[in-house]
């Protein structure tokens, strides 16, 4: 009888793990389904505009969209380099343009 109990307990463990994974996948899918399709393009265009003035990496900008019952929020975070690096980059750009 203990041998049968061994197989039964692993089955419920496997079912529990599968259920947990499925819940994660469903939550992930719901998050991306409610996200507007224009966000990647918006992020790229914002990067182009910002790069006109300051040299930043692709990872320096993040766009986050949240949707509640009555409102939608678009959060934009940009990590700008320190002002000394910005000045040097701008001066180099001016020197290289002549």
Curated annotation (Swiss-Prot):
Alphabetical list of Pfam families matching this protein: MinE
Source organism, top-level taxon: Bacteria
InterPro entries per UniProt: MinE, MinE_sf
Protein's GO biological process: cell division; regulation of division septum assembly
Keyword Cell division annotated: yes
Keywords: Cell cycle, Cell division
HAMAP family found in the cross-reference section: MinE
Entry similarity comment: Belongs to the MinE family.
Function: Prevents the cell division inhibition by proteins MinC and MinD at internal division sites while permitting inhibition at polar sites. This ensures cell division at the proper site by restricting the formation of a division septum at the midpoint of the long axis of the cell.
UniProt protein name: Cell division topological specificity factor
Native species: Nitrosomonas europaea (strain ATCC 19718 / CIP 103999 / KCTC 2705 / NBRC 14298)
């Amino acid at each position: 009888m203990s041998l049968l109990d061994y197989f039964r307990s692993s089955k419920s463990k496997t079912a529990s793990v599968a259920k947990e994974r499925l819940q994660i996948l469903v939550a992930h899918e719901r998050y991306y389904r409610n996200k507007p399709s224009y966000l990647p393009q918006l992020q790229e265009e914002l990067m182009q505009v910002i790069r006109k003035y300051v040299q930043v990496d692709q990872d320096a900008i993040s766009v986050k969209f949240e949707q509640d019952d009555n409102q939608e929020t678009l959060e934009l975070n940009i990590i700008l380099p320190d002002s000394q690096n910005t000045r040097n980059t701008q001066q180099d750009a001016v020197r290289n343009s002549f």
